[in-house]
């Protein structure tokens, strides 16, 4: 898009539109941030600072920090200082109570509900986001499993099934997210113990696998046994992805 040139040496692409959200999950890159870092000053001055950054994010960041409009033909009377980019502020997926954290932490409070029926429900008896404590694993055991969390998750899944009754749909009602494969296997094992065959069809996976899908209820098992594990969960775009994947309420 940016490099194509016409026979006259001018930009071959007169206008293009990119729609996305760089504050949600990026593409999966095997290298860590240090390995993909770019140190060439010429490239860094052009906005290319890390190979993990998408073209969308690089352009957005450049336009935010640039004092001049890179695309002068896109002048807007309503936003003269940001003529080449804007934000879509209406979301129709989450109830406002679920969206509140992501809205404040990632979008500066600018997200507004469309006003769809599931967003307008006002049930004072429902707490739409709940944080439950769990016991860490004993010293010397694997940091990538937590039996206490797995049992809690299985019990919540069973409660959700009982609450929904005949309307429970394993592919739409409930999803369980956790960062480690070992914890996924442990949660599935605990769910089988519940003796509810319908729960065997629910998706238990990492947040990357949930990208683009949604559920009424999301259970997030952090599986943090030691303080050092917190830095592995510090990717804010992943945490944002967890909230965006939820429709009605979240029960970690």
What are these regions (language model features)?
Residues 1-251:
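Conserved helicase motor core of SF1/SF2 NTP-dependent helicases
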């Amino acid at each position: 898009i940016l490099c194509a040139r016409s026979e006259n040496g001018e930009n071959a692409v007169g206008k293009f539109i990119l729609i996305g959200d760089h504050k949600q999950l990026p593409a999966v890159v095997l290298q860590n941030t240090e390995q993909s870092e770019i140190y060439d000053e010429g490239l860094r001055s052009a906005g290319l600072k890390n190979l993990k950054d998408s073209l969308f994010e690089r352009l957005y960041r450049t336009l935010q920090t640039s004092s001049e409009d890179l695309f002068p033909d896109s002048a807007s009377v309503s936003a003269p200082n940001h003529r080449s980019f804007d934000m879509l502020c209406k979301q129709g997926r989450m109830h406002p109570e679920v969206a509140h954290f992501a809205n404040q932490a990632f979008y500066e409070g600018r997200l507004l509900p469309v006003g769809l029926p599931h967003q307008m429900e006002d049930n004072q008896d429902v707490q739409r986001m709940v944080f439950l404590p769990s016991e860490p694993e004993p010293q010397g055991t694997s940091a990538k499993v937590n039996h206490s969390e797995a049992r809690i998750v299985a019990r919540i899944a069973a409660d959700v099934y009982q609450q929904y009754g005949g309307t429970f749909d394993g592919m739409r009602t409930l999803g369980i997210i956790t960062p480690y494969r070992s914890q996924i296997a442990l949660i599935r094992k605990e769910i089988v113990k519940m003796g509810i065959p319908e729960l065997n069809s629910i998706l238990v996976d990492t947040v990357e696998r949930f990208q683009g899908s949604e559920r009424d209820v999301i259970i997030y098992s952090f599986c943090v046994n030691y303080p050092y594990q917190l830095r592995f969960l510090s990717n804010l775009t992943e945490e944002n992805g967890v909230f965006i994947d939820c429709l009605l309420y979240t029960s970690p």
